[in-house]
Curated annotation (Swiss-Prot):
Residues 17-158 form a propeptide. Its EC number is 3.4.24.-. It comes from Tityus trivittatus. The keyword Glycoprotein applies. Binds 1 zinc ion per subunit. It comes from the Eukaryota. This is Venom metalloproteinase antarease-like TtrivMP_A. Pfam families: Reprolysin_5 (PF13688). One of its GO terms (molecular function) is metalloendopeptidase activity. The active site is at E320.
């Protein structure tokens, strides 16, 4: 048994909220012989042109969730990594588009009246802007007993692909925001298509795969959620307590997707933060994850909050994922990573504005060179065995 102490480190980030600026548009869509879709429209002072490629590989071969037509969903997923677009394009009937256009714009069918022009349904463009500061936390594990790397069953081979597999669980507060499992799955799929776009900025060829989603309700929520809920108001969690409980829960319940996956993420619509003496909670934390926890059954957990309707936490999920892949915050040294010999990120100041820093233009949707080096280092270690797969297997 490995015993450890977890140190919690915080970094200020910003969240995004709808600005109130919206516009109704009729996008044009053209499909080339190669299958690339070009979407064009003008809205909110932006001339948008996207070159979208199929991204159905985001869903694993055996993606699992109840009451969802997975193959139909797979055909609808498109992305433009250059512009950060992650969209569901439905051509069964009048064409509809929903999802992330770029860092500032979201698109969805305009349901009020179902206006149709030249066979195209009207769409609503919503602008999101950076808002109040929140915090990210990472649990750095100081192990008292070193792991034996010789016990790793499979090492990476030259022709392997790097594929990070995710199992997503949602708490009842997040689940009840959606009318159906299908609507929830659409939202989560767009979210992780956006994560793939951000992972591409590492230039390490890392693929993102969703193995499945379990949408908990009030009756089915596991003990690590129920037992650690602070009643508030509002209902909330203490992040370091929750990540410890979640990690222990899945350490003791290594079955099915929880066993097979590389990372397990809880998405919650409840807040996270520090309890006050009066019983309320200072909501200040967007996400938390275990440092370098990938492939470790008892440490491969991460948590992200999302109480929006417009997929504004894609960057949080990418940020927490990279903590799990061995990167600290920019500006932090190797002592903030649970990987012996890690180069750390002290040479990349947080003020440079990358995803693992304080997120400012022009770098706020990219990872720093230090983050890349840290992830590369973890990928070189035997303990990262689980994310290497034969390319024909996915």
């Amino acid at each position: 048994m490995i015993s450890y102490l977890a140190s919690i480190f915080l970094l200020a980030t910003v969240s995004a909220v709808p600005s109130g600026r919206v516009e109704v548009v009729f996008p044009s869509v053209e499909t080339s012989r190669s299958g690339v879709k070009t979407v064009k429209f003008t809205a909110l002072d932006q001339n948008v042109e996207l070159k979208l490629r199929s991204a159905g590989e985001i869903l694993g071969k055996h993606f699992a969730i109840q009451d969802v037509d997975v193959e139909s969903l797979r055909r609808k997923i498109y992305r433009d990594s250059v512009n950060g677009a992650a969209l569901l394009i439905d051509e069964d009937g009048p064409l509809t588009i929903e999802g992330i256009v770029n860092s500032k714009l979201r698109i969805q069918p305009f349901e009020s009246g179902r206006i149709i022009k030249d066979g195209m349904i009207a769409h609503q463009i919503v602008e999101v802007i950076d808002d109040k500061k929140s915090y990210d936390r990472v649990a750095v594990i100081h192990e008292n007993v070193k792991r034996n790397a010789e016990n790793v069953s499979r090492m990476a081979e030259e022709n392997d692909c790097i594929v990070v597999e995710y199992y997503i669980v949602t708490d009842s507060a997040f689940t009840k925001r959606f009318k159906s499992n299908s609507a929830l799955t659409n939202y989560v799929t767009v979210m992780f298509t956006g994560v793939q776009n951000l992972m591409d900025t590492l230039e390490l060829g890392i693929g993102v795969r969703l193995l499945g989603v379990t949408a908990f309700n009030e009756e089915t929520e596991p003990s690590f959620i129920k037992d650690n809920l602070i009643p508030g108001p509002p209902e909330a969690f203490e992040p370091d307590v929750l990540i410890t409980a979640m990690s222990q829960y899945y350490c003791n319940h290594q079955t099915g997707l929880a066993k097979d996956t590389d990372l397990i993420f809880l998405i919650t619509a409840r807040g996270m933060g520090d309890p006050r003496e009066d019983g309320t909670v200072d909501i200040n934390t967007a996400g938390i994850a275990n440092s370098a926890g990938v492939c470790k059954p008892c440490l491969k957990a991460g948590i992200a909050t999302d109480d929006s309707n417009y997929n504004e936490r894609v960057d949080t999920l990418a940020h927490e994922s990279v903590h799990l892949l061995g990167s600290p915050h920019d500006g932090e040294g190797p002592d903030q990573v649970s990987v012996e010999g890690s180069p750390g990120a002290a040479n990349c100041p947080a003020k440079a504005g990358y995803i693992m820093g304080n997120r400012k233009d022009p770098n706020k949707y990219k990872f720093s060179p230090c983050t890349k080096k840290c992830v590369e280092y973890l990928l070189s270690k035997p303990t990262a065995f689980c994310i290497f797969e034969q390319c024909s297997d996915f």
